[in-house]
């Protein structure tokens, strides 16, 4: 087995007293599978890419939020103008008396959902705090580490307030149409999605919404939905014993032959080849 790449805190933190830092990815390039000896929060600002976390693929774009534990293995591939920020931290160095474990899924290797979404309002507020955190964590002045940790605590609580699961934007949310569209797409894995119906319900222009989506994500709406479904199919092929025809249905493809064509085009191998190759990892 190939040696697992591991990123070390000595290469990313200014001192062994620093608990928090910000690592920009403008843009994020393809990055091989790796682990760390620190943890990170990942927030995607725009563009798209394939994020594989613990063998589960996610097609990511603006608003995606991940909580990554040190032992998690992840990689980035098929990136397209993918812009994100990593807020990296060492749990053992945090000194503030906050309920870190309650606010950060997977904190100290506890069980927790790693993937969430942020709407435009949450993203705007997070970006402001991250800007302050990035500035403070790069300072070499008294109490810079303490100030950075205070800002990190603020960011963690802010994310806790605004995050939601990818397919369930709160009904009372005042988020933008783009946020609501991405949520609706994530909830349409098995069922057909009709953009014209969505636009009628939202009283918006289909043409304008298509333009906004492509500008922010680097993909068309159909491309995004297709790739989200393929990612789900990859996961089911590796981690379930469902027949390929049943997986096709679970992922919104009425015709299993068409599913195979799309899957092969997106991944470079047939569903059965993918299953055989990846079953060897389990």
UniProtKB/Swiss-Prot annotation:
GO terms for cellular component: cytoplasm. CDD domains: cupin_RhaR_RhaS-like_N. The keyword Repeat applies. GO terms for molecular function: DNA-binding transcription factor activity; sequence-specific DNA binding. Residues 179-277 form the HTH araC/xylS-type domain. The record marks 246 as: Interaction with sigma-70. One of its GO terms (biological process) is DNA-templated transcription. It is found in: Cytoplasm. Residues 196-217, 244-267 bind DNA. Pfam families: AraC_binding, HTH_18. Its activity is regulated by L-rhamnose. When this sugar becomes available to the cell, basal-level RhaR binds L-rhamnose and becomes activated. This is HTH-type transcriptional activator RhaR.
